From Swiss-Prot:
GO cellular component: cytoplasm
Functional pathway: Purine metabolism; IMP biosynthesis via salvage pathway; IMP from hypoxanthine: step 1/1
GO BP field: IMP salvage; purine ribonucleoside salvage
GO molecular function: guanine phosphoribosyltransferase activity; hypoxanthine phosphoribosyltransferase activity
Natural source organism: Methanohalophilus mahii (strain ATCC 35705 / DSM 5219 / SLP)
Record's subcellular location: Cytoplasm
Family as reported in the entry's similarity comment: Belongs to the purine/pyrimidine phosphoribosyltransferase family. Archaeal HPRT subfamily.
Subunit structure of this chain's protein: Homodimer.
CDD domains: PRTases_typeI
Name of the protein described by the UniProt record: Hypoxanthine/guanine phosphoribosyltransferase
Catalytic activity, as annotated: IMP + diphosphate = hypoxanthine + 5-phospho-alpha-D-ribose 1-diphosphate; GMP + diphosphate = guanine + 5-phospho-alpha-D-ribose 1-diphosphate
Length: 190
């Protein structure tokens, strides 16, 4: 299961970003090109193993866009994107967030109190982005059916679990200067 994803992760090049070894992958970076078969495999898996009884799919730009698009096209469920730019629309939610890599603001539009959403993201490391996003959505009165992240690295999933936020990952990895290794199933994937 998820063989295309696992194989592509093992081939991912590694670069150094500050003190972090960072993997470059189509699903997390859009580089190199995203293979439609990879996106198809991932979206099929998410649809099969997620609670799809939702009003909306919500994902984070930039790399959440192809994921949400693929799922939306297959299910007919509309999607909204958490943006890094403010639009000043009525009901816009502003989130100040900090991750292991950056700080900044995110903006949510098109989600209303009482909505039930599937939250999809490309990668989790520290859990910072999801922590702030979940808190903002809950304060707005939005129900999150599932949180699905394609690639888990670091201890973000465990940190969020300790705060009562359950995140499902498709694949958990370890990244070193030598490359990406796939970790054994953690039981959090489905």
């Amino acid at each position: 299961m998820l063989e295309i994803l696992k194989k592509s992760l093992k081939k991912a090049p590694i670069v150094k970003r500050g003190k972090y070894p960072y993997f470059i992958h189509p699903i997390t970076d859009g580089v190199p090109a995203i293979d439609p078969k990879l996106l198809d495999e991932i979206s099929d898996y998410i649809i099969e193993y997620s609670d799809m009884d939702v009003d909306r799919i919500l994902s984070i730009e930039a790399m959440g866009i192809p994921l949400a698009t693929a799922i939306s096209l297959k299910t007919g469920i509309p999607f909204s994107i958490v943006r890094k730019r403010q639009y000043q629309l009525p009901g816009e939610i502003k989130i100040s967030q900090s991750t292991g890599y950056s700080k900044g603001e995110l903006y949510i539009n098109g989600i209303e109190k009482g909505n039930r959403i599937l939250l999809v993201d490309d990668v989790i490391s520290t859990g910072g982005t999801l922590r702030f996003l979940v808190k903002a959505l809950e304060e707005k009165g939005v129900t999150i059916s599932d949180i699905i992240v394609i690639v888990g690295r670091g201890d973000g999933v465990q940190q969020l679990a300790g705060e009562g936020i359950r995140v499902k990952t498709l694949v958990d990895i370890n990244v070193s200067e030598d490359g990406v290794s796939i970790l054994e199933d953690t039981g959090e994937t489905n």
